[in-house]
């Protein structure tokens, strides 16, 4: 099986904030829920600091605010008012935490939105349409296929899913089994879905098996030099259409068939495309946002499940 693809973002979230922000005192119970709470000597206000894997960080006052999404207001949301934001934020006005942590937006405001939300990420390189996020019952797509959320008591901020296997070209990849993605009793291993990670990372044995299967299916394509973390690249310059093997992620209860643009991506202007997966020496695998593009990804926290609806950005 193969995809025929023609190679012929902006991501925004409109949130209004009140002019009045209530800074939290250092003695606030909310302040003590921060991983690394700080306290201003001048004002005795609670301060936060968060660092990210790419080296970016934000520092400022921990405050209460009313957020407005179009006509819906959500009062008394605890958030950080950043005074020092550095790194790869690329002009973003802020970050909305959507994880399972105690201070994430879904946790704080979940009951108002029936503990349901979904997003659809558009292709940054090919679409002028903005990405979207929906809260409430309307977030649940009728065409979504669902897989259960697995709880990791040792690390409860992430959404863990059960990945059973991967198919390439219509055949299960030999060497990939559910055991490579299993969450063990110590909280290690497993698979999470994360909108903040670009490229899907698989445990090294799973990645090597997937990569090798794809290389066999794409052996008719001209290879190109490696690029950054991508070790499987092709020279597609001058080709208006290319056939590549299909890639399907098999979650428990949900098979997710990826569009070709979600795993063979352009990395320069000379026609070089790379297989957009990578390996990791860690036991934790991550489903990144490139592989999520174009799907409406539904988080039904009330039902403890995550769903995938193809062509969900319409």
Residue ranges and their predicted role:
Residues 1-77, 83:
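Signature of the N-terminal lobe/flap region of pepsin-like aspartyl proteases
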Residues 1-30, 67, 95-99, 181-221, ...:
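Aspartyl protease active-site motif detector
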Residues 19-20, 24-25, 32-40, 61, ...:
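Processing junctions and N-termini across compartments
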Residues 45, 51-161, 270-313:
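Aspartic protease core domain of the pepsin/retropepsin superfamily
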Residues 53, 79-85, 135, 153-165, ...:
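Aspartic protease catalytic domain
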